[in-house]
UniProtKB/Swiss-Prot annotation:
The gene is tatB. It comes from Escherichia coli (strain K12). Induction: Constitutively expressed. Residues 117-171 are annotated as: Disordered. PANTHER family: SEC-INDEPENDENT PROTEIN TRANSLOCASE PROTEIN TATA, CHLOROPLASTIC. This is Sec-independent protein translocase protein TatB.
């Protein structure tokens, strides 16, 4: 991959030994080897994906060529029937556009009302119906709960710590 000979590899090893020292050189070699391994696997993956994409593109191109060839090699009977179908589809399309049933259906189902600007004009001649019974709910007072009494901090007596027995208090 890098086209390095034995003498060049030996020279790089000696320079690395002088620069890094005998303790850090093995760690550096492992790190560089890991980088090279990762680059190789990445290059292989990219190469495989490109190869698959090229094969897929070639397959699609050949498929298109076969489809075009099969359409040009149709029998005259099939060509005539395809032309008839195209003409029938176009005539149906033209008649559908000319007699658009959806527009006619929308127009037939549209309710035409004059715009009412005044609220009183909308309710002209309408009287409200009288209610036979009026709904009511029983009157209840909300329940009150007594609030807890809190003693002020001034009434509280400070507690003093009891002296602890020590060895000097003994007789």
């Amino acid at each position: 991959m890098f086209d390095i000979g034995f003498s060049e590899l030996l020279l790089v090893f000696i320079i690395g030994l002088v620069v890094l020292g005998p303790q850090r050189l093995p760690v550096a070699v492992k790190t560089v080897a890991g980088w090279i391994r990762a680059l190789r696997s990445l290059a292989t993956t990219v190469q495989n994906e490109l190869t698959q994409e090229l094969k897929l593109q070639e397959f699609q191109d050949s498929l298109k060529k076969v489809e075009k060839a099969s359409l040009t090699n149709l029998t005259p009977e099939l060509k005539a029937s395809m032309d008839e179908l195209r003409q029938a589809a176009e005539s149906m399309k033209r008649s559908y556009v000319a007699n658009d049933p959806e527009k006619a259906s929308d127009e037939a189902h549209t309710i035409h009302n004059p715009v009412v600007k005044d609220n009183e004009a909308a309710h002209e001649g309408v009287t409200p119906a009288a209610a036979q019974t009026q709904a009511s709910s029983p009157e209840q007072k909300p329940e009150t709960t007594p609030e807890p009494v809190v003693k002020p901090a001034a009434d509280a007596e400070p507690k003093t710590a009891a002296p602890s027995p020590s060895s000097s208090d003994k007789p």
